Amino acid sequence: MSNLTGTDKSVILLMTIGEDRAAEVFKHLSQREVQTLSAAMANVTQISNKQLTDVLAEFEQEAEQFAALNINANDYLRSVLVKALGEERAASLLEDILETRDTASGIETLNFMEPQSAADLIRDEHPQIIATILVHLKRAQAADILALFDERLRHDVMFVSHLWRRAASALAELTEVLNGLLDGQNLKRSKMGGVRTAAEIINLMKTQQEEAVITAVREFDGELAQKIIDEMFLFENLVDVD
């Protein structure tokens, strides 16, 4: 099995466990990892019985080792990387791996929750914290959650258009909030947000709610409201073209 890379082995394992389980695995991977595995999977033409048997045997052995030793995964990974790459390179790579693993995983939890449950979870937080969370969600999920807030809270979507500048000041509070709500997950600083994000989310709301939000934004900042409307119009045109 020496000719198989780690990616090859992962692809074989994913193709073995079935579509539903493979999809669940993908939910826990970064976009880059999903792209790498998907590209490799698309190039698979044939898997021999020996390759399949070897991969499953290796996976079983690794799984049993972790279960039997109750091993600390981070410590184990660090030891392996140090032996393979040396102390300095291992430390740098491990930092990147753990940062990628932890990035926005708490936010991903909200993406898969029922909108009502997610809305109930965050509705009592500061509007800026709620807005910061919403711009990291899938647009449809964010719109559904917004629709469940009262009118006054929905209007605070105007914060979204400035979040990329406010993210640093809100980050500490946001991390603390999510630590309590979602079992200690972390949020990596991001430049997500802006007029486009606001427009995409508002576009997915019901017409009456959409108009109310735009009206509230216009009262606060007419120029900003017009920018959002222009972006919404552009977004709708792109959808029509598709």
Swiss-Prot record:
GO terms for molecular function: cytoskeletal motor activity. It holds the Pfam family FliG_N. One of its GO terms (biological process) is bacterial-type flagellum-dependent cell motility. InterPro entries: Flg_Motor_Flig, FliG_a-hlx, FliG_M, FliG_N. The keyword Membrane applies. FliG is one of three proteins (FliG, FliN, FliM) that forms the rotor-mounted switch complex (C ring), located at the base of the basal body. This complex interacts with the CheY and CheZ chemotaxis proteins, in addition to contacting components of the motor that determine the direction of flagellar rotation. NCBIfam families: fliG. This is Flagellar motor switch protein FliG.
